[in-house]
């Protein structure tokens, strides 16, 4: 499955450069020029990663970041800025940004950061699937009166630190 990236920058040359290099790396890339357009694009088809400029017309990147992370917490966001400060980078990170990159952008660094962020996405998906497998592997099946009573007892004792031994056939 192709990983999808949304580039959000009001400078068309930056969008084109990032779109070109990331497409060459095998990613499916879309580009928009404002925070509002980004939110609409994410609502229609959430990407795996967003490259988001801080200084955008209308809604700025930090406001867009807040909304993106509240509505789509699984989407990784890398912030970009030509006038960034340490305070801005810290604020972006606290709001949920994966990383912060300063302009002029080193395309090598962007590719490296994108790969790391998408590795994190892959690991989170894998972790979720493994947890589901473990849960379903040890799930009690059946709807008999005895099984339902057993499930109720387990539900009651589960929050405690007590050791429980369940014995019976099979």
Indicate residue ranges for each PLM-predicted region.
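Active-site beta3 strand of CheY-like receiver
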Residues: 45-51, 56, 78
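Two-component/phosphorelay signaling modules centered on CheY-like receiver
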Residues: 12-30
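C-terminal output helix
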Residues: 85-87, 101-114
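Acidic catalytic/metal-coordinating carboxylates
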Residues: 33-37, 60-63
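The feature encodes the CheY-like receiver
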Residues: 15, 54-60, 81, 85
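AAA+ ATPase active-site-proximal loops
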Residues: 131-170
């Amino acid at each position: 499955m192709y990983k999808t990236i949304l580039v959000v920058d009001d400078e068309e040359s930056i969008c084109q450069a990032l779109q070109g290099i990331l497409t060459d790396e095998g990613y499916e890339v879309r580009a928009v020029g404002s925070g509002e357009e980004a939110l609409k694009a994410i609502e229609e088809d959430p990407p795996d990663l967003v490259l988001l400029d801080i200084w955008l017309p209308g809604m700025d990147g930090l406001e867009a970041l807040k909304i993106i992370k509240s509505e789509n917490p699984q989407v990784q966001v890398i912030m970009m800025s030509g006038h960034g400060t340490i305070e801005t980078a810290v604020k972006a990170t606290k709001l949920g940004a994966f990383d912060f990159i300063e302009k002029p952008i080193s395309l090598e660094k962007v590719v490296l950061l994108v790969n790391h962020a998408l590795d994190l996405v892959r690991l989170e998906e894998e972790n979720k699937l493994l947890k589901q497998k473990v849960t379903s592997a040890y799930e009690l099946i059946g709807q008999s009166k005895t099984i339902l009573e057993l499930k109720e007892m387990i539900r009651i004792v589960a929050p405690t630190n007590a050791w429980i031994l369940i014995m019976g056939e099979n």
